[in-house]
Amino acid sequence: MFLSVVACFKNESHILEEWIDHYQKQGVDQFLLCDNNSTDDYQSILDKYDNIILHKDSSAQIQWGTEFPRGKYGDGIYSKLLTEHKTEWAIICDPDEFMYAREGYDTIRQFLEERGSEFNQLIVPNILFHHKPGTDIEIKEQPESVVDTFIYASRMDKNVKSIVKVDSITKLRVHEHAVEGRSTRPNLKDDFVLTEGTANSKYGCLPIVPKGGYKGSAPGGAKGNMW
């Protein structure tokens, strides 16, 4: 496979279909998913697709780094999934995170096919989205579409997620990963050396402005990864 999404979820059937459809439109080949003891009807959603690989966790709760034996890319469920199911590139994210292609490219896949030789990891900043201006307004019912409802962008969050070339990984993490070779932001100008001893927070606060600047509202989800 060329491009896969890797994620764990728990009781997120309300968003799974929109999330999977979004990434399929971005050129994703397969989804490597782990169910963390969900009690909702997620299976009826996943049954609609033929490119889902599902691991069901048998423990009380997934524990980072201890739940599964050490694999090729480190400890934990993500290493297990990526060791057993081959893919060239992986987007490791949560079901409330929607990543979009950079301006000038139709899909994330197209961007990786054309520019992927320039880096081994793309570190993408998070932006939180809300359904109305202000962060303290509660929403009473689950909207039909997260992307169409949460349209007001807040300031860029310090956290990031990554698109990573799997064969370059030396240690998997939650946000960005230790890799051999070049790690960069989506502008392809900022370089970082991320090793197993590097603290994540050192890189989480670096400012980056999306091409065209910030907008008061934009398509997004509960979280949107802006390029």
Residue ranges and their predicted role:
Residues 7, 34-44:
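Ser/Thr-glycine-rich phosphate-binding loops at phosphate-binding pockets of nucleotides
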Residues 29-30, 88, 120:
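Short acidic/polar active-site loop segments enriched in Thr and Asp
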Residues 1-21:
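N-proximal low-complexity "stem/linker" segments adjacent to membrane-targeting elements
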Residues 36, 94-98, 103:
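Short acidic donor-binding/metal-coordinating loop in glycosyltransferase active sites
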Residues 67-72, 101-227:
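Catalytic-site signature of metal-activated, phosphate-bearing donor transferases
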Residues 43-92, 100-101:
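Active-site-proximal specificity loops/subdomain of glycosyltransferases
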Residues 29-37, 56-58:
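Short beta-strand/loop segment that forms part of the nucleotide-sugar
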Residues 21-30:
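Short, acidic, metal-binding catalytic loop of nucleotide-sugar glycosyltransferases
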